[in-house]
């Protein structure tokens, strides 16, 4: 049988039908057995599966036993992220301080920070010929695929890959944190060259520059960027670095609990983050706004904007999902602190780039969407913009291509993954093994000729 022949496709369709039918489970059984689908209870609250000191995500206050909506708060190792952002103001090394804080549980003094940055600069260099042999010789249209493949391949370049002592895991994590921006940037350059016939431009990272500065330098042919651009990207990395028990971080814990190597654990987390329900959400926001702009020509016409957004909720527009992307969050109620921070930087960047009218459009959509969603939900829970709402807009103003939107998330979040992997290993927990209840029937085996 030949692949893609008529007979091949017919059999594949038949087998697909078997899979679909066999995999169906009566949805009422999930209720009958009180299954916590998505590891959340009926109110949307996450099921407690572990303890951590790395971050705290607060979306509501509890008063007299009742959950009361409040402005969201996010803490890294006990520090409010909004306080960190104010402390980092004007700096381009906020992400480096955040790395240190997440990994070691405290903010560094000047000497500690200097040594840490010097170590990260050493780790940033990829193995000899890795760029040519691994990144450029096997280009991909998806940069998350590039990151995942490169991480697994780096296992082969490590003289001690399977040692899960804390010292070795820390060394591996610091190397990967430093190398992620370089791999993503080079992967994108290879993608442009091989799939779009553009000139291949490979710059070397420059010592003394921050992660944000080096990333902008690596993806731009002229290597130029403004102070504000570097500051904004730095803050983007800070606010994406960690966020509690999200899917990819939980994946880090699950895989690390098996005792496997760092490269396998990080590659698994990348696979989680790649999913459109997780790390790919900001891309959906950008695509939704592109569709809005093609349908609503007058951005000052709030009635037209409301009509378009109502159409989205009625599954009559864009991707017919019934969703307004970038609105609402599983934990936050009144507001997402990351969105509050990013909104302010988006406004500053829009002024520098001459895109204030577009920023005003985002503000209008945020306000109208929140009102429409709250009216439809009827739960009394406020609906606010999440971090994905403004991040895509910020990235476009920074000239970052959509192919790198989710990789930027990974460049930031690997700091959090690393901290959680180390925390899992330090506490030597049991292998994570949740229960699945069998709801099928037991059958007797029949010989093939009797089936």
Regions found by a protein language model. Name each.
Residues 1-451:
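Non-transmembrane, aqueous-exposed alpha-helical and coiled segments at domain scale
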């Amino acid at each position: 049988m030949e692949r893609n022949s008529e007979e091949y496709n017919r059999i594949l369709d038949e087998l697909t039908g078997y899979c679909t039918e066999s995999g169906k489970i009566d949805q009422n059984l999930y209720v009958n057995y009180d299954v916590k689908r998505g590891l959340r209870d009926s109110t949307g609250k996450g099921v407690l599966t572990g303890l951590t000191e790395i971050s705290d995500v607060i979306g509501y206050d509890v008063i007299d036993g009742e959950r009361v909506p409040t402005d969201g708060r996010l803490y890294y190792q006990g520090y409010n992220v909004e306080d960190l952002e104010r402390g980092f103001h004007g700096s381009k090394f906020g992400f480096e301080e955040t790395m240190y804080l997440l990994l070691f549980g405290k903010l560094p003094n000047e000497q500690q920070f200097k040594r840490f940055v010097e170590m990260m600069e050493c780790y940033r260099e990829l193995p000899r010929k890795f760029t040519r042999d691994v990144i450029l010789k096997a280009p991909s249209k998806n940069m998350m695929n590039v990151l995942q493949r490169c991480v697994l391949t780096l296992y082969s370049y490590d003289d001690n890959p399977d040692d899960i002592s804390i010292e070795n895991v820390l060394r591996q994590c610091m190397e990967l944190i430093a190398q992620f921006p370089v791999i993503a940037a080079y992967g994108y350059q290879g993608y442009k060259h091989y799939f779009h016939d553009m000139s291949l431009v490979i710059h070397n990272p420059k010592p003394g520059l921050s992660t944000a500065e080096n990333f902008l330098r690596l993806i731009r042919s002229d290597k130029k960027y403004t102070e504000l651009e570097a500051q904004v990207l730095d803050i983007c990395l800070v606010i994406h670095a960690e966020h509690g028990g999200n899917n990819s971080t939980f994946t880090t814990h699950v895989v690390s609990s098996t005792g496997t190597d760092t490269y396998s654990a990080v590659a698994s987390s990348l696979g989680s983050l790649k999913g459109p329900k997780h790390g790919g959400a900001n891309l959906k926001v950008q695509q939704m706004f592109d569709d809005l702009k093609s349908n609503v020509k007058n951005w000052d016409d709030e009635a037209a904007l409301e009509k378009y957004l109502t159409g989205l909720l009625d599954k009559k527009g864009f991707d017919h999902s019934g969703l307004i992307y970038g609105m609402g969050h599983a934990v936050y109620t009144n507001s997402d602190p990351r969105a509050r921070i990013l909104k302010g930087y988006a406004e500053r960047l829009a002024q520098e780039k001459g895109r204030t009218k577009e920023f005003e459009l985002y503000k209008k959509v945020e306000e109208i969407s929140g009102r429409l969603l709250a009216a439809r939900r009827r739960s009394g829970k406020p609906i606010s913009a999440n971090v994905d709402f403004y991040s895509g807009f910020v990235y476009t103003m920074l000239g970052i291509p959509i192919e790198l939107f989710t990789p930027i998330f990974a460049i930031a979040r690997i700091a959090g993954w690393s901290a959680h992997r180390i925390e899992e290993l330090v506490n030597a927990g049991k292998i994570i093994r949740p229960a699945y209840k069998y709801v099928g029937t037991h059958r007797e085996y029949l010989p093939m000729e009797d089936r």
